[in-house]
């Protein structure tokens, strides 16, 4: 049974810390986005190879998360969190001393493998620590904290790049990891109260995940979430080159343009939090997916040579990604309350799998213009709508 809250924290502090854990992914990606062209030159490689470092990170994230969920269901959240964060710290330091693109790719994979512990256990601890009726609200509040990462990281990354070089960005990530590890070690109590009651082997990993995916509502929710994050990461991987190389925005100003869409996420999350208190979550999702459809069509109609025409649908799509996420996660936690770690691991892993596919497609088809990025995001919007339609059942809207 969930406990009222983590006994060594007040609820606000716990939400802020868990939101920071969930933000490990965007923080680790967005911090070095302004440096991608610089890294390509420093390591004597192509833009396509450096873009691959984003896909490599997403791969490591997906793989790591699939392990952390079931392991935390069995052995507890705290010890697994500390192990994953330790891997993240060491790998971040390895990234800073990489002298070739191959070394950077390996270090980024390991950094992601360790960092994947944050999104999985951050949300699983919410299920452990708060009553069911508060989960959507708590996840929405966590989302606001999480969004500080993509809002601040490009600004900080651009400044660090300008004054210290791209290597220091990874050292800063390692330092953030150390601070979070120390907080978890000294202040975070164990929240999984029945962790010793579950048998665990490789077969149960796959049985748990297959059991989740066999349920149409769970499959549809995960597909929707994966596609939305795929579009998000196509935007993340594409905009450094679109903004800096195509529209000639200075690297130190990139964070401002990136931050506009983060403001969209914050606004959409606040509006979503207001709406779910008054309407059924399924109704709110239906309205949000209608806006996703409009944004998807706008990507096809946008003039690729107009920065404003590109940024307007991006603002809508990226903002909606932040609003939709807590609603879908809440639905999954309610459907799989006795395997919260596994459910969050699968959902979060598939999120970043969608990001891997979308950013990989962008890297493969990239033609040094915004058009490819717009088409990839539009395709992701269509897949997300299909996923949402799968979740619809008779009486689901009124439930």
What residue spans do the PLM features occupy?
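Paired small-residue
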Residues: 87-94, 102-110, 308-314
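A late C-terminal transmembrane helix in Major Facilitator Superfamily
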Residues: 333-371, 376-377
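Structural signature of the two symmetry-related core transmembrane helices
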Residues: 79-93, 283-298
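Helix-breaking motifs and short loop linkers at transmembrane-helix boundaries and internal kinks
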Residues: 44, 76, 97-103, 114, ...
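Conserved MFS/SLC helix-loop-helix module at the cytosolic interface between two early adjacent transmembrane helices
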Residues: 63-102
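Juxtamembrane intracellular "pre-TM" segments in multi-pass secondary transporters
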Residues: 2-7, 191-221
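Cytoplasmic helix-loop-helix junction between adjacent transmembrane helices
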Residues: 107-148
